[in-house]
Amino acid sequence: MSIFGRCDPKFQQVADEFEQNFLERGEVGASVSVTIEGETVVDLWGGTANTELQTKWEEDTVSIVWSCTKGATALCAHILSYRGELDIDAPVIKYWPEFGQAGKENITVKMLLNHQAGIAAIRKPLPEGAYGDWDRMIHALEEEVPFWEPGTRNGYHALTFGWLVGEVVRRVSGKSLGQFFQDEVAQPLGIDFWIGLPEDIEPRVAKMILAEPQIDAPFYKKILEPNTVQSFIFNTGGLMEQFDSRSGHAAEIGAASGITNARGLARMYAPLACGGSLGDVKIVDEETIQRMSFVSSATGQDANLLVPTRFSLGFMKSIDNRKQPQGFQESIILSEDAFGHAGNGGSIGFAAPTEKMSFAYTMNKMGAGITVNDRGQSLIDAAYKSLGYKSDRSGTWMR
């Protein structure tokens, strides 16, 4: 198995685990990147990008990163907050008056970021391809009735998060979510990362290999149960196979359609690990990063995912569910002030401010879970161990 790229000798453990993912854990094509104090110390890739065409995973290969996109979308909202243009504690209707229908008038922007708004799905089935029609999706969300009283429960907004937060970004900035992200994050940082992929980049996109669903897991059982919030998740005009298509890549789905690689995802988080700036590019300030790091919502049972979750205004926090019963063990083991987001099947990106480290892993063979699996976690573990950290079964990294 050939691994390409570069790795600082101090982080050789990451390179070793990356190779083991291919040799022992079924990896097909992937990339991993780590930055320390804004400098890249790991930038590796390898494997096959498209098993049907037998194309190699190249240096510039990119792939859909599913819910890692939520981190990019949340960052856009935080940028507007840092600039004084968006009050995260304000009601959504301050910026989006039409949203205040059907019992949603008191929902705040903070509730959207915390997955507490109760608009975790759309009950009415939408026509195929609706996910690519922003106005249609926004109108459907304006009409939707909350599944629970807003602010009283935490329930992961698997797809609706992107349109809800993205529309706030659009109303405040005057730009679409994808354009705002390009103008304020991707282009200033010089990264290959799109929410709404240009057609000329399409040949570089790796083809995802979907995992068999965990049919015995409680979350998947609920998908098959009529009239549950889980059963309505894909009432957005497309299933996962359609999201990983040209039309899905082109759509600005702020919860799921981001296209990048580990290099781009890690570099997006690099300034967030370093006080808000990378070189001459200032993204946010230290106070904003503290808000990103602080746990703002947590629950013993997420109303949608049915597992314990912890969030920090749009970002996932470290959560150790490994001792939970079978089917409830979705986990991400990070340092305590780290924040980021995992993507369905195993991709992940995060910032660890104490360590001044950013990390990202992307791949095309999806695992069955909705957070990281043994491939991603082994790389995360190796990065922390390279910095001299140790972990115990409590999931706490110590040095």
Protein language model features and the residues they cover:
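Catalytic-site signature segments of enzymes, centered on catalytic residues
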Residues: 61-62, 121-204, 242-260
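Active-site SXXK
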Residues: 12, 18-19, 38, 62-89, ...
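Active-site-proximal alpha-helical segments within enzyme catalytic domains
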Residues: 115, 161-168, 252, 256-278, ...
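A short, polar/charged loop-to-alpha-helix boundary motif
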Residues: 50-60, 368-380
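Active-site Gly/Thr loop motif
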Residues: 208-262, 290-354, 390-399
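Hydrophobic (often cysteine-bearing) scaffold residues that line and stabilize catalytic clefts
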Residues: 10-14, 65-69, 73, 109, ...
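Short, conserved catalytic-motif segment at the N-terminal edge
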Residues: 3-66, 87
